Amino acid sequence: KSTLMKIIAGVEKSYRGEVVWAPGYSVGYLEQEPQMDPDKTVIEVVQEGVQEVMDVLNEYNEISLKFMEPMDDDQMNALIERQGELSEKIEHLGGWEIDAKLERAMDALNCPPPDAKISTLSGGERRRVALCRLLLREPDVLLLDEPTNHLDTESIQWLEAHLRQYKGTVIAVTH
C-alpha cells in the first residue's frame, strides 16, 4: 500500500509504467516518516504549508517599513501602488487571518509548541507537524499514508471532519 502511494506521489521511481496528472494539479503526500529540516522550529515548518501567503505578507511588511525612510513622491507612489496590490492579494488568499488559521490547525492536531525545534520531536510529533503543514497547503490531491498514526482520539475526529469537507481528492491508506 505504501509503495502504491509513493508511486502516485512521484516519490518511487523503480517501477514500470507511468503516472500522469492533468496539468496544474498539485499533489501532497504524507509519508510514514516525514522529512523536515531538523534546525527549523515547528512554526517554521507549518508555515511552509502556506508559503505563498507568508511571502506576500513579508513583502507587505517590508514595504510598510520603507514608508519610514525618506523618499521622493514617485518612490512613495510606487510603494503605495505595490502595497495596494499586495493588500488585494493578501485579501484574496485569506492572509489577514493566517495566524489564526495556523493556530487552529496546530491546536486541532495537538502539535508541539511553535518554538520547539524539529530535532527534539518524537516521531509522532513530527508526523503531526507534517500533517498540519500538508493540510494547510491544500493540494488538489491529498495522499495520506496512515494519517491517524500517533493522533489522539480528538485529533482523529477533527481530521475526519476536515477530510469530509475537503475540496480536493483524498486517498488514504489506513488499517
Feature locations, PLM:
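ABC ATP-binding cassette signature C-motif
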Residues: 1-175
